[in-house]
């Protein structure tokens, strides 16, 4: 039964993701996706790192050393936050320029994707319709068994399970058949889309000039990004210096204190 439940869960999840992929009306821009990912990642590191620092300072060794790491950590995260704010507009400009330079290529690829999407959409709709019908049939078959369980005694649980197992296996087999049918129907269109994408890149490769042009423009944008990021990175370096110096002084003081205690013994 666990295998049946897992199979159905995979089918539900796969179906929902596929529908989201084909019917997404308002996709995020490249910059928004990168920004969201970076924000989540940095915040996770910041929170987990602060937890570790707090735990260390609360330990016996941390209290003995008294490094004041938490104060340094807060200063460090504040410095990183300022740098991130400074780099935000610069990075946004980089992505905007890169998207502008590759607009023509992306439009052609999106056109190919939309054409293939229109061809496969009827198959996806038909699959969803059949899947809903199968679920309805399964619910109708299971409903009387649920009523039996409510009215019966505990000894009927095993009997109910014996009745449910073949129904679940039947639904699993029918679902597999529908998935296999959908896979066979979509296979030619997947190949078509793959061939179209390959043809687009082959045209770029044969054109030579276009490919070199894309590379040159990307290199130019990266160079401009590096130049504009220099002030923010310098601010980061200047902000880190007092933090590192403070940490260095605390560590040396702790070592000196430990040495004095050892000599006194």
UniProtKB/Swiss-Prot annotation:
It is found in: Secreted. Residues 67-265 are annotated as: 10 X approximate tandem repeats. One of its GO terms (cellular component) is extracellular vesicle. The modification Methionine sulfoxide is found at residue 109. Glycosylated. Its main location: secreted. One of its GO terms (biological process) is cholesterol metabolic process. Keywords: Cholesterol metabolism, Glycoprotein, HDL, Lipid metabolism, Lipid transport, Lipoprotein, Oxidation, Palmitate, Phosphoprotein, Repeat, Secreted, Signal, Steroid metabolism, Sterol metabolism, Transport. One of its GO terms (molecular function) is protein homodimerization activity. Participates in the reverse transport of cholesterol from tissues to the liver for excretion by promoting cholesterol efflux from tissues and by acting as a cofactor for the lecithin cholesterol acyltransferase (LCAT). As part of the SPAP complex, activates spermatozoa motility. This is Apolipoprotein A-I. It comes from Balaenoptera acutorostrata scammoni.
